[in-house]
Curated annotation (Swiss-Prot):
It comes from the Bacteria. Keywords: Aminoacyl-tRNA synthetase, ATP-binding, Cytoplasm, Ligase, Nucleotide-binding, Protein biosynthesis. It is an enzyme of class 6 (ligase). Belongs to the class-II aminoacyl-tRNA synthetase family. Type-1 seryl-tRNA synthetase subfamily. Pfam families: Seryl_tRNA_N, tRNA-synt_2b. Catalyzes the attachment of serine to tRNA(Ser). Is also able to aminoacylate tRNA(Sec) with serine, to form the misacylated tRNA L-seryl-tRNA(Sec), which will be further converted into selenocysteinyl-tRNA(Sec). It catalyses: tRNA(Ser) + L-serine + ATP = L-seryl-tRNA(Ser) + AMP + diphosphate + H(+); tRNA(Sec) + L-serine + ATP = L-seryl-tRNA(Sec) + AMP + diphosphate + H(+). ATP binds at R268, S269, E270, E355, I356, S357, S358. GO terms for molecular function: ATP binding; catalytic activity, acting on a protein; serine-tRNA ligase activity; transferase activity. SUPFAM superfamilies: Class II aaRS and biotin synthetases, tRNA-binding arm. The keyword Aminoacyl-tRNA synthetase applies. NCBIfam families: serS. This is Serine--tRNA ligase.
Length: 435
């Protein structure tokens, strides 16, 4: 959530910044108008409360002196009514103000490419050239099906579209990938956490998914009243429980920066994705992802973003997967992010790079919503900065391995770093199948 004081004191700058993220200037004008009225009512209420205290003392004094206090009592009643009216208005205006603030995205960093969509993203660097073959490479969904290690048809029978079964070497490869990621992340100084996969609304609001993105997630409903959702949602990313671990907490400065990592399933409705990536592992309703989260001081967050991005790059490099890093435009960056780097891995069969990680600096945007603060050496409280990044999306990594390490005979060579995680298996060949 943005700081209303920053908007109030820098209205033109705020309009210019948020215009690059699709926010109309009238929305900020309305917000500041509400804020002005709210602060005026709050000041009047505080003045009347001070007056009520004075009148209360006068009444007590008159009663001690056995004097008539009826006029003062009547005045205090009228003051009380006015206070009640003003406080109600303040509450209503606060609710309106928060309604708008909770739906405004983060201010973009000055270094962000300006543009409405991903066509304005800018390549920052590239690692290795795209994989070349002496034969026409197969798509990972064909490889997985032919090898008998991925089964979308039976998953569709059981769960519907955008679900998959991993079988035999496929399941082993998926497990090898996320165990490798977790081991590498812990070597890089991250503490591993196994978080809850169901979170409450306050947590979803803390990281910015609610109230704006209800349609993108799966919420648990009450069996006795299906129209009434319970206060529980399946996590769309481990970022939610990891960041909210620190919600309403005060961290001592000497504990920062904090680095945590987790592997979890991620559940997404993929609202608005009809017709996109209908085959394969790229866009699923349920998938596994390893997440990295950092909590740090404001003056450290930009350096920490570079470290976070390099941590994610390190994983792709050890796997030998070609990729490039792109800086997202103001119109393509996520709601909570001030700056995002996407890592996109090369997919030979698609002949293009596909996102496998997003590394974002959310500055104090999430910390303000979730009240994540730290106490400095002088005892003063400050909002922390939060960062998050995929390290990495597991299913997409499996897809990239299948496509980049495929052989002409349809087998897939296991990347060297994964062989110990695959019980020594160096090549995936056709499975006999369960049925």
């Amino acid at each position: 959530m943005l700081d209303i004081k920053v908007i109030r004191e820098n209205l033109d700058w705020s309009k210019k910044k948020l215009a690059t993220r699709g926010i109309k200037p009238e929305e900020l004008d309305e917000l500041v108008e509400i804020d002005t009225k709210r602060r005026k009512d709050l000041t009047m209420s505080e003045q009347l409360k001070a007056k009520r205290n004075d009148v209360s003392k006068q009444i007590a004094e008159k009663k001690r002196n056995k004097e008539d206090a009826s006029d003062a009592i009547a005045e205090m009643r009228e003051v009380g009514k006015e206070i009640k009216k003003l406080d109600k208005e303040v509450d209503e205006l606060t609710e309106k103000q928060n309604y708008i603030l909770l739906r405004l995205p983060n201010f973009p960093a000055d270094s962000d490419p300006i543009g409405p969509d991903d066509s304005y993203n800018e390549e920052v660097r590239k690692w290795e050239e795209p994989t070349k073959f002496d034969f026409k490479p197969k798509a990972h969904w064909d490889l997985g099906t032919d090898l008998g290690i991925l089964d979308w048809d039976r998953a569709s029978k059981v769960s519907g579209a955008r679900f998959v079964y991993y079988i035999g070497a496929g399941a082993l490869l998926e497990r090898a990938v996320f165990n490798f990621f977790l081991d590498e992340n812990t070597k890089d100084g991250y503490t591993e956490i196994i978080p809850p996969y169901l979170v409450n609304d306050a947590s979803m609001q803390g990281t910015g998914q609610f109230p704006k993105f209800h349609e993108d997630v799966y919420t648990i409903v009450d069996n006795d009243d299906p129209d009434k959702p319970r206060d529980l949602t399946l996590i769309p990313t481990a970022e939610v429980p990891l960041v909210n671990y620190f919600r309403n907490e005060i961290i001592h400065e000497n504990k920062l920066p904090i680095n945590v990592t987790a592997m979890s399933p991620a559940f997404r409705s993929e609202a608005g994705s009809a017709g996109r990536d209908t085959r394969g592992l790229i866009r699923m309703h349920e998938f596994r992802k390893v997440e990295m989260v950092k909590i740090c001081k404001p003056d450290e967050s930009w350096d920490e973003l570079e470290k976070l991005t390099h941590n994610a790059e390190h994983l792709l490099q050890k796997l030998g997967l070609p990729y490039h890093v792109v800086a997202l435009s103001t119109g393509d960056a996520s709601f909570t992010s001030a700056k995002t780097y996407d890592l996109e891995v090369w997919m030979p069969a698609q002949d293009k790079y596909r996102e496998i990680s997003s590394c974002s600096n959310c500055t104090d945007f999430q910390a303000r919503r979730a009240q994540i603060r730290y106490r400095d050496e002088d005892g003063k409280l400050h909002l922390a900065h939060t960062l998050n990044g995929s390290g990495l999306a597991v299913g997409r990594c499996v897809a990239a391995i299948l496509e980049n390490y495929q052989n002409e005979d349809g087998s897939v060579t296991v990347p060297d770093v994964l062989v110990p995680y695959m019980n020594g298996m160096k090549k995936i060949t056709k499975e006999s199948g369960l049925i």
